[in-house]
Amino acid sequence: MNTAISFIKKNTVMVIALLAAVITSFIVPPDEKYLHYFDYKTLSCLFSVLAVVCALKNVQFFYILACNIVKKFCNIRLCTVVLVWVTFIGSMLIANDMALLTFLPLGYYVLHTAGKERYMAFTFIMQNIAANLGGMLTPFGNPQNLYLYSKFNIPIGEFTLKMLPPFLLAVALITVCCVIFVKPEPIELKDKPEKIDRKRTAAYLFLFAIAIIIVFNFIPYWIGMIFITLTLVVMDRKALAAVDYPLLLTFVFFFIFAGNMARIDVIKDFFSSVLQINTLLFSVISCQFISNVPSAILLSQFTSDYHSLLLGVNIGGVGTLIASLASLITLRQYNTLNPGKTGRYIASFSAFNFSFLIVLTAFCMLLV
């Protein structure tokens, strides 16, 4: 009994996702269409990056890199800004979920190395917002952008120009938050970094490059995943054992929930009518309940106003924990590193995210 309770506490979000999937499965009984719910590429990329990040942790890569960042910058405020900006840039290049999987461990090691763990929740929240909003600028910055870019055949120049104003506002807001909420306290290393295993680190960085190449479709995702898995079986089986499999299952259950929601006639009819009133506003609201990727797929069937829809499903990625499934990655990482503090984190997460959501929604309403 105690073991079950402990498991539920540790994997609360996964259990909620499972319940949501099971409940909606009574409304939409399982059939062959369920197989189309899953974004197999996303799941493969998540597994690949999680596995490689675990391997890099095992050779102290992030710890040594964090030590170098601490030595480079004179105070914790600058370190925080750098971490958030790196996540911003990373989300534009390798997508929001991959950026978080890569740079959240770096954020942890920077703060831990500097002895500034009290800024952990704030830094993770800002990195999360940066990942969700930084990806809006490019078609491959997040899954919903890639889907809408392909469905509506949006010219790349038009796409970038449409998303540039809210992107610049997001950059400004996050930078201001870092300046206000993080004091310019001097920092120094608590421990002397160990020497890095160059050969193993080089091999794991090569595997990380393979994981990123999968995102850009240079090789089929299943080939990349198999190659990474087999390599780690030989080089570091502990990395495969350390993969956060409950996080992967959380995504699976949410895919089922969102897919079922999109097939319920009452919900489909509702969205069809409200989108005629205000596509931007209702796409933002939709994201808060069924996440931004399912919202983009569902709502694109009922509107041709791709500009408003594009804005809505991007800024709608902030707000609730399920507004963007990438936020579940951050929650899971924080809960693992800071057990027992999840409630406080969710409260801070909600306060910052809804503040950003209100400001960005009001701004985008002026653009459309």
Where are these predicted regions, by residue range?
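C-terminal transmembrane helix pair
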Residues: 160-171, 281-368
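Interfacial loop-to-helix junctions that mark the boundaries of transmembrane helices
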Residues: 4-10, 32-42, 154-166, 193-198, ...
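Hydrophobic transmembrane alpha-helices that form the pore/transport pathway of multi-pass ion
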Residues: 85, 89-133, 147, 297-311, ...
